[in-house]
Amino acid sequence: MINLRKTHPLMKIINHSFIDLPTPSNISAWWNFGSLLGMCLMIQILTGLFLAMHYTSDTMTAFSSVAHICRDVNYGWLLRNLHANGASMFFMCLFLHVGRGIYYGSYLYKETWNIGVILLLAVMATAFVGYLLPWGQMSFWGATVITNLLSAIPYIGQTLVEWVWGGFAVDKATLTRFFAFHFILPFIITALATVHLLFLHETGSNNPLGINPDSDKIPFHPYYTIKDALGLMLLLLMLLLLALFSPDLLGDPDNFSPANPLNTPPHIKPEWYFLFAYAILRSIPNKLGGVLALLASILILLIIPLLHTANQRSMMFRPMSQTLFWILTANLITLTWIGGQPVEQPFIIIGQLASMLYFLLILVLMPLAGMFENYMLKPKW
């Protein structure tokens, strides 16, 4: 009998992507995050779909519809907690996935990397518009402050802000359109993720050594399917622990109060996964400068392949670059902490130093370290 998975037009694609795919034999647990992100996306789309069945995107009823979901809908509290904390798990996996790419030089697959950066931006946009939907205090003021940054654009700024708002303030029109964006974007992300995979399978996976693994490859199934299954179990365990035992751990208490345009919260801050970028934004006293720094903090990822100076692809055998990479990691954690603090000393100066170090590390120190390591490895006789 002819093997259907190798001949059927649809099954053939699945077979070449997830079953008979030749995979390097030495990829570590850091290569699990792609499948974990796929799982996160599926969880978010499913929980989001069921939440959307009960949610109303109207300023008068949005807040109470979320309360209704939690109180009156069967397992509505679980859906909401999984969706809110699923976003946190999503970003956790995203940051680790990007970090893995930087550490092991995966960014040298330029098409895959660039689509990945676009995916990161799309997920950030989805999370941002989704945060307005519960119509709590922090939802309202967070959306007001961040959308208002568009007004820093010379000449067209103010017009642009009012165009995004659909009026002169964040109101019903804004909520309705943000709900529409929040619904459509995950499907765009799914399409982009497919393209991301398509480009990856053109070249094959990178591996911890950063060398050509063609001489030693194994089929994806059963080796990596079982490995991915273990990762998924651990992800689900962590998500359930978070959603069932401390669902409000990562949220803001201000969001338990309905949105009130007449009362500003003492500290306006976004969700934890945006705090590093928010800290960079706040560290520059000029509005336009801050907005440009905010954009640069993410878009800098696009030029990382151009800044690769080392002869070795991976950082596995490059101690100087490794040290700088872990300093960058610590720096991002510091920025995340600063983003959640009030604008006063010593937080201002710490934020400014950390922001400066962030760009200095990526643009200057890491490329220099790569060049120095090349020099050190050159035969001296």
Curated annotation (Swiss-Prot):
Which InterPro entries is this protein grouped with?
Cyt_b/b6_C, Cyt_b/b6_C_sf, Cyt_b/b6_N, Cytb/b6-like_sf, Cytochrome_b, Cytochrome_b_C_euk/bac, Cytochrome_b_N_euk/bac, Di-haem_cyt_TM
Q: Which parts of the chain span the membrane according to its record?
A: 33-53, 77-98, 113-133, 178-198, 226-246, 288-308, 320-340, 347-367
Give any GO molecular function from the UniProt entry: metal ion binding
The alphabetized UniProt keywords are: Electron transport, Heme, Iron, Membrane, Metal-binding, Mitochondrion, Mitochondrion inner membrane, Respiratory chain, Transmembrane, Transmembrane helix, Transport, Ubiquinone
List of residues binding heme b b562? 83, 182
Read off the SUPFAM superfamilies from this record. a domain/subunit of cytochrome bc1 complex (Ubiquinol-cytochrome c reductase), Transmembrane di-heme cytochromes
Which Pfam families does the annotation name?
Answer: Cytochrom_B_C (PF00032), Cytochrome_B (PF00033)
Q: Which PROSITE patterns match?
A: CYTB_CTER, CYTB_NTER
Q: Which cofactor does it need?
A: heme b
Its localization reads:
Mitochondrion inner membrane
Primary location class: mitochondrion
In UniProt terms, what function does this protein have?
Component of the ubiquinol-cytochrome c reductase complex (complex III or cytochrome b-c1 complex) that is part of the mitochondrial respiratory chain. The b-c1 complex mediates electron transfer from ubiquinol to cytochrome c. Contributes to the generation of a proton gradient across the mitochondrial membrane that is then used for ATP synthesis.
Quaternary structure and partners: The cytochrome bc1 complex contains 11 subunits: 3 respiratory subunits (MT-CYB, CYC1 and UQCRFS1), 2 core proteins (UQCRC1 and UQCRC2) and 6 low-molecular weight proteins (UQCRH/QCR6, UQCRB/QCR7, UQCRQ/QCR8, UQCR10/QCR9, UQCR11/QCR10 and a cleavage product of UQCRFS1). This cytochrome bc1 complex then forms a dimer.
Name the chain's protein.
Cytochrome b
Species of provenance: Pseudantechinus ningbing
